[in-house]
Amino acid sequence: MASVAAARAVPVGSGLRGLQRTLPLVVILGATGTGKSTLALQLGQRLGGEIVSADSMQVYEGLDIITNKVSAQEQRICRHHMISFVDPLVTNYTVVDFRNRATALIEDIFARDKIPIVVGGTNYYIESLLWKVLVNTKPQEMGTEKVIDRKVELEKEDGLVLHKRLSQVDPEMAAKLHPHDKRKVARSLQVFEETGISHSEFLHRQHTEEGGGPLGGPLKFSNPCILWLHADQAVLDERLDKRVDDMLAAGLLEELRDFHRRYNQKNVSENSQDYQHGIFQSIGFKEFHEYLITEGKCTLETSNQLLKKGIEALKQVTKRYARKQNRWVKNRFLSRPGPIVPPVYGLEVSDVSKWEESVLEPALEIVQSFIQGHKPTATPIKMPYNEAENKRSYHLCDLCDRIIIGDREWAAHIKSKSHLNQLKKRRRLDSDAVNTIESQSVSPDHNKEPKEKGSPGQNDQELKCSV
């Protein structure tokens, strides 16, 4: 149904009357701070489209500042979907839930002859809309509550126990997952329990479908128009630091205090706070944890130090997240292997003073080309796929007593400071052991005539053998 809706041919405006067009699914990628929401709003206004947010934190009610939601005024200018509809206390909302709801919305937007514009920073949410990459363990009409609850139950068990169980039913998937990655291990076990088919077998079937590839199944929509906003890293870092300052000026601390008081204070008092699930994963909340729980209980100087520490941590983690987002785009979009991979068009956003000519106008031209069925004049960005770099191999470092998943991660580990320190320590211990053996083997009075019984030279030979 999605492909049919996406390929719906509708009459164009009066300037091109008589022609036919195929409405595209517009997707805007980019790291945080590149202006994705701004471009989506502008395209939505110009093209009469509707915006579908693809942000795993913006689905929750609350924390509007820290999750950088569009304002109520902006939502009135252009209709937005998938924002602020999940209760903040819900901790088991998944990408499957997002995919099911957002796909239905996109089909509805197409059915009303409008252009859906998908925008957000959660790239695997966007992947779930573009490609067949997820596994349905239950019929959609039955809902996902029971399935999700089973995954939650599994996550309560010990990670090593879960991983051992997975290695018995799906050794191929177990070899790709770290025992500490409990959520993914639990998900793979859930797939097997609910279907009787291993997770890896499901993925193999997707990859071998017509249009599928090494990273997933075929495209779900026939005419995706993908735009990638990118900027010089130094410029983006500076912009992100300013964004944090702007958030603080907009009332970030008050928002965090209120949210902590309403939703998290009881958990902290019971030492059961969880920054791994739900909205509590949001960048910014855990960075101010110490400040929030000690505010009013310590000296002003200590409180100010914790506040400063939280602000600096927020700036650093935001910049790291931006780099992670760009790596994901390069690995999963720009260098994606497979027979049918949609083009990705890059838009340079380093100089915001040139936004109109460098970003908005080229974006409109690209989208209009898709609408009219023409190939854009802009050249898409394509990077070579490095199969070895993406290989999720299992490595065990006996020296550090660590499991490393991934060839790239393994290469980084053996060059890491911690591994090299362990290597030096091992060599030092080995050297000390050799010296000890040598000192024990050589008698203090070795220059004297041996008095032990035995044939001549026997003891000398034993000494030589032991050194």
UniProtKB/Swiss-Prot annotation:
The record marks T122, Q206 as: Interaction with substrate tRNA. Residues 55-58, 183-187, 281-283, 313-331 are annotated as: Interaction with substrate tRNA. One of its GO terms (molecular function) is ATP binding. It is an enzyme of class 2 (transferase). Pfam families: IPPT. Its EC number is 2.5.1.75. A zinc finger (Matrin-type) spans 395-425. Keywords: ATP-binding, Cytoplasm, Disease variant, Metal-binding, Mitochondrion, Nucleotide-binding, Phosphoprotein, Primary mitochondrial disease, Transferase, Transit peptide, tRNA processing, Zinc, Zinc-finger. Changing K286E: In COXPD35; uncertain significance. Residues 433-444 have a biased composition (Polar residues). GO terms for biological process: mitochondrial tRNA modification; tRNA modification. The keyword NAD does not apply. It catalyses: adenosine(37) in tRNA + dimethylallyl diphosphate = N(6)-dimethylallyladenosine(37) in tRNA + diphosphate. SUPFAM superfamilies: beta-beta-alpha zinc fingers, P-loop containing nucleoside triphosphate hydrolases. Residues 233-255 are annotated as: Interaction with isopentenylpyrophosphate transferase. It is linked to Combined oxidative phosphorylation deficiency 35: An autosomal recessive disorder caused by defective mitochondrial metabolism and deficiencies of mitochondrial respiratory enzyme complexes. Clinical manifestations include global developmental delay, intellectual disability, microcephaly, and early-onset seizures. This is tRNA dimethylallyltransferase. The lineage of its organism: Eukaryota, Metazoa, Chordata, Craniata, Vertebrata.
